[in-house]
Structure formats: structure tokens, C-alpha cells
């Protein structure tokens, strides 16, 4: 309760009432996440039912021809509870900004970065957890982490030229054999119980993902060496970095930050929308998340931080490592004039510097201020936005999360760029699976939008203009 009160003071009266309401919903002394959900869900079901009865026919927005041909950009068509992306403020997790999460969410003993367990608790419940609640979640995931033997055998027999994301997707799909939801659905479980089985599967999957991801890493880059055993006294990120083979406490802190800030980014991005869509068919969390990972593997979604590193490396190769602002400016213009973009800058929704970039920059300033690659990234931060503004084409000239993450991973020795999207995937599970639980709890139906052909669209427009 003291933590909730502190949060209310930090966020002001606007959010204080929400925090007090959350405190009434579930005792801060309760550490069982499922029990808290069981209390929250009926209240939220009733609230939404009343809202729909009163406002179900209210028009939310208009759809244009350009939206239909342009990837549905800007089209309001989904309800997604766990996070909202504001063009100016960036992502808010259940109403909390990244700086607020960094301040309020529990941290490891001696650590400074938020624990992803706390972020998951927040995404699921809307409440800032206590240290005891986060500790319960760490131990619960450790208890559920063991992989079935057929998945281990599968991972060990993949060819080394199979992309890490393909391995992740296949292994998660194979975990479907363990699905509580699929089994219960086949036995005719009541719809009101769907969320409980989705919760169990989601908890199991999140617990097992670091083991899968670490095994992929060890098989591909560490000659198949063992990942070791899960330590129930360590947090989720610490166990993950141990299994990867990294013992630097700063790298573990980076991983806590990385897994927190990449967890969710509203519902319209490819991975979030895919899990939502596939889950609406009542596919279990393993199948839904595997589908999301196939979307994340696409170069337009999950490969951006690799593209940044490739561009930075090429820049250093062509103009040197200690480059003047003037030479850097010329190189940026050459990139743009050749028809290419500056990777790591711009965003489909954001119109300011991505707060996920900012917190990584702060981490670098604290832990690696003299690293040459970080200094180059910092130098670009001063120059690129002005060049893009001069060019006049970019709606958002500011850096996004991908402009920084790869540089930090490289500094601590993780140089295998093909693997970076796997880390992204492990993190993204927190957001999309939290939402999947709520999608089933709220009874969201099968997603089935109406499509039109170009011919049909032309006839429709003609009828409107005539």
C-alpha cells in the first residue's frame, strides 16, 4: 500500500484515483497473480458491458481509401488494454510512462533497473506490484521453466544454418503439446474458464522462453554447451543471462532494462496484432505466440537494430572512427540522397524521441560513456534530426529504440546480430500474452474484418461521388 501511495504522489491526482481503486480491488499482501485476476476480471467485464450498452453505436473514426491501401495506418480498429502509444509521450504501460516504471517498479537487490516481472504484473493487473509480489512471480516462473524432452531434442537437432527466429518459432509451436487450454477446450470447458487456462499456458510459456532462447544461443554460438540449471533464488533476467553464459552484473542490468522496454508497444504492430488475431481463433498461447514470432522475424519489424549496426559499421569503415560533425553530416546527406533512410530514426506513430531510446542512452552514459560506438550514436543524435528536418520528408526525425539497443549488446560482448530478434521476442511475450489473457477474459470474438477489391472500392467511391 505504501508503494501505491508513493505512486499516486508521483503521478498526481489524475492517476491517483485509479491507484486507490486498484488497491481496493486486491490486497497488496496477496502474491498470487491468478487470484488477483479472478477478482479484477468480473469488475472489468461489468464495466465494459455497461460501456458498450451505452455507447456501442458511437462512431470512433473514419476510414479512407489511403488507409486501406496503406497498411491500415492510423485506422482505429482494435481494443488493446495493456499499453497505449502516444505520438508525443511514447509508450505508456497501463498508464505509466517508461520513466515512471523505472522509478516505481521493484528492482533486484543492488540493482537500478526495473524487473520485467514487475512490468508483467503491471500489464496484467494495472497495479504497481510490491517486492513480495515480484519475488513470487520470479519463483513461479523458475518453477515452471523446465523444457519437455522432445523440445530439447528438437532444438539440439536443428541445423546450424537455421535462423534463430525459425528455431524459436518451431520450439514454441512444439510446446503446444503441453497446452492446458488446448486440452481443456477439447474436453468442452466453459467459456467463462477460458482465461484461467490461457493464464496457465502464458505463465508456462514465459517461464520457458529464456531456456529456449539460451539453448538456441548456446547451440549456434557456444558449440552446444549446456545452459545449466534454473536458480529459483534469481530473477527471470538473471537466470536468462546466466544460461546465455554472461556473468557481468551490468549485462544482467541491461537485460532487465531491455526485456522491460521491448515488452509491449500497443496492439497494432505486427507481432501484437498477429498474436491477437491468431488468439481470436482460440488458438492456444503457444500457437498464437509462435505466429507473432514469425511476424517479428520479418525485416520490417524485428531486424531494425541489426540494420543500425550494419550502417554504423559501414560509416566507420568509410569515414573513420573519430569523425567530425561536418563529415558525419555529409555522410548522412549521402545516405539520404542515394534513396536510403538513416536506420534507427523515425517511427510510424511517434513524433518525438522514443523514450525507449532515452532510457538506453541514460544507461550508456552511466556505464559506457567512453565507448567509441556509443559516442558515435550520441554524435548522430545531435546531427541526424536536423538533417532530416532540412530534408523535409520525415514526419518524425527523432531516434527510436533500435538506434541504441544493438550498440549496448555489442559492448557487453553479444555480437551475434542474427540473435538479437530472439531477445526482442522473449521480451515481447510479456505484453502480448498479458493481453491474450485479457482478450479471453473479456470474451473478444473471432477477428473478421471486411475486405474489398480495388474494383469494388472504385465502384463504392463512384457511387459516393455521383
From Swiss-Prot:
Oxaloacetate binds at residues 356, 428, 448. It is found in: Mitochondrion matrix. Belongs to the citrate synthase family. Homodimer. GO terms for cellular component: mitochondrial matrix. One of its GO terms (molecular function) is citrate (Si)-synthase activity. Key enzyme of the Krebs tricarboxylic acid cycle which catalyzes the synthesis of citrate from acetyl coenzyme A and oxaloacetate. Its main location: mitochondrion. Its EC number is 2.3.3.1. This is Citrate synthase, mitochondrial. Transmembrane segments: none annotated. Gene3D superfamilies: Citrate Synthase, domain 1, Cytochrome P450-Terp, domain 2. The modification N6,N6,N6-trimethyllysine is found at residue 395. The modification N6-acetyllysine is found at residues 76, 321, 327, 375, 382, 393, 459. It comes from Macaca fascicularis. The modification N6-succinyllysine is found at residues 57, 76, 103, 193, 321, 327, 375, 393, 450, 459. It catalyses: oxaloacetate + acetyl-CoA + H2O = citrate + CoA + H(+). Methylated. Trimethylation at Lys-395 by CSKMT decreases citrate synthase activity. Keywords: Acetylation, Methylation, Mitochondrion, Transferase, Transit peptide, Tricarboxylic acid cycle, Ubl conjugation.
Amino acid at each position: 500500500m505504501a508503494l501505491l501511495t508513493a505512486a499516486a504522489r508521483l503521478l498526481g491526482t489524475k492517476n491517483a484515483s485509479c491507484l486507490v481503486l486498484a488497491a481496493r480491488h486486491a490486497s497488496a499482501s496477496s502474491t498470487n497473480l491468478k487470484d488477483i485476476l479472478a477478482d479484477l476480471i468480473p469488475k472489468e467485464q461489468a464495466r465494459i458491458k455497461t460501456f458498450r450498452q451505452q455507447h456501442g453505436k458511437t462512431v470512433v473514426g473514419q476510414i479512407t481509401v489511403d488507409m486501406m491501401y496503406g497498411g491500415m495506418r492510423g485506422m482505429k480498429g482494435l481494443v488493446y488494454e495493456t499499453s497505449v502509444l502516444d505520438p508525443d509521450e511514447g509508450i505508456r504501460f497501463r498508464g505509466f510512462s517508461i520513466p515512471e516504471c523505472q522509478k516505481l517498479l521493484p528492482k533486484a537487490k543492488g540493482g537500478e533497473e526495473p524487473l520485467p516481472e514487475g512490468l508483467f504484473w503491471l500489464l496484467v493487473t494495472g497495479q504497481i506490484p510490491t517486492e513480495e509480489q515480484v519475488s513470487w512471480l520470479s519463483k513461479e516462473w523458475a518453477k515452471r521453466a523446465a523444457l519437455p524432452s522432445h523440445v530439447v531434442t528438437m532444438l539440439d537437432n536443428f541445423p546450424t544454418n537455421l535462423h534463430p527466429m525459425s528455431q524459436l518459432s518451431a520450439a514454441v509451436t512444439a510446446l503446444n503439446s503441453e497446452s492446458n487450454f488446448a486440452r481443456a477446450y477439447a474436453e468442452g470447458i466453459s467459456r467463462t474458464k477460458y482465461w484461467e487456462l490461457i493464464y496457465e499456458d502464458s505463465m508456462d510459456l514465459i517461464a520457458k522462453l529464456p531456456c529456449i532462447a539460451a539453448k538456441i544461443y548456446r547451440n549456434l554460438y557456444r558449440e552446444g554447451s549446456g545452459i545449466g540449471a534454473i536458480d529459483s533464488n534469481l530473477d527471470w533476467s538473471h537466470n536468462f543471462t546466466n544460461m546465455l553464459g554472461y556473468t557481468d552484473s551490468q549485462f544482467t542490468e541491461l537485460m532487465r532494462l531491455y526485456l522491460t522496454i521491448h515488452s509491449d508497444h500497443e496492439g497494432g504492430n505486427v507481432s501484437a496484432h498477429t498474436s491477437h488475431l491468431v488468439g481470436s481463433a482460440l488458438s492456444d498461447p503457444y500457437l498464437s505466440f509462435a505466429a507473432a514470432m514469425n511476424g517479428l522475424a520479418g525485416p520490417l519489424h524485428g531486424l531494425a537494430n541489426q540494420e543500425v549496426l550494419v550502417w554504423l559499421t559501414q560509416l566507420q569503415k568509410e569515414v573513420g572512427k573519430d569523425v567530425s560533425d561536418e563529415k558525419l553530416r555529409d555522410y548522412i546527406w549521402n545516405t539520404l540522397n542515394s534513396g536510403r533512410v538513416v536506420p534507427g530514426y523515425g517511427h510510424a506513430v511517434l513524433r518525438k524521441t522514443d523514450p525507449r531510446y532515452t532510457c538506453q542512452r541514460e544507461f550508456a552514459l552511466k556505464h559506457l560513456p567512453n565507448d567509441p560506438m556509443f559516442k558515435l550514436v550520441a554524435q548522430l543524435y545531435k546531427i541526424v534530426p536536423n538533417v532530416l528536418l532540412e530534408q523535409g520528408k520525415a514526419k518524425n526525425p527523432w531516434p527510436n529504440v533500435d538506434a541504441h539497443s544493438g550498440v549496448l549488446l555489442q559492448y557487453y560482448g553479444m555480437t551475434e546480430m542474427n540473435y538479437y530478434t530472439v531477445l526482442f521476442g522473449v521480451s515481447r511475450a510479456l505484453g502480448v500474452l498479458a493481453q491474450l489473457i485479457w482478450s479471453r477474459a473479456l470474451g473478444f470474438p473471432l477477428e473478421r474484418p471486411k475486405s474489398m477489391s480495388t474494383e469494388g472500392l472504385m465502384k463504392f467511391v463512384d457511387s459516393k461521388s455521383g
